[in-house]
Amino acid sequence: MTTIILNPNEPVEVALRRFRRSIEKTGLIKELRARTSYEKPTTERKRKKAAAVARLRKQVRRSMPPKKKY
């Protein structure tokens, strides 16, 4: 569970921003959105495989030297 301590003389907006940042870092919002509806195991595997392929393409693209622009 994510908790934050409100510092003295700290505006509520700043504390709320800190709370949202900490929630996002833990990945709680992403997990909640994933659990809102059932995803079949085959669909989940397909989505994860596509994400892995995209990550690999991105990694290869970054490791290549930049193209020369004449």
Swiss-Prot record:
The lineage's top-level taxon is: Bacteria
Question: What ranges does the record list as Basic residues composition bias?
Answer: 45-70
For this UniProt record, give its keywords in alphabetical order, as a comma-separated list: Ribonucleoprotein, Ribosomal protein
Record keywords: Ribonucleoprotein included? yes
**Spans annotated as Disordered:** 38-70
Q: List the disulfide bonds.
A: none
What are the BP-aspect GO terms?
translation
Gene Ontology MF, one: structural constituent of ribosome
Q: Which family does it belong to?
A: Belongs to the bacterial ribosomal protein bS21 family.
Instruction: List the protein's name.
Output: Small ribosomal subunit protein bS21C
Its taxonomic placement starts with:
Bacteria, Pseudomonadati, Pseudomonadota, Betaproteobacteria, Burkholderiales
Name of the gene encoding the protein in the UniProt record: rpsU3
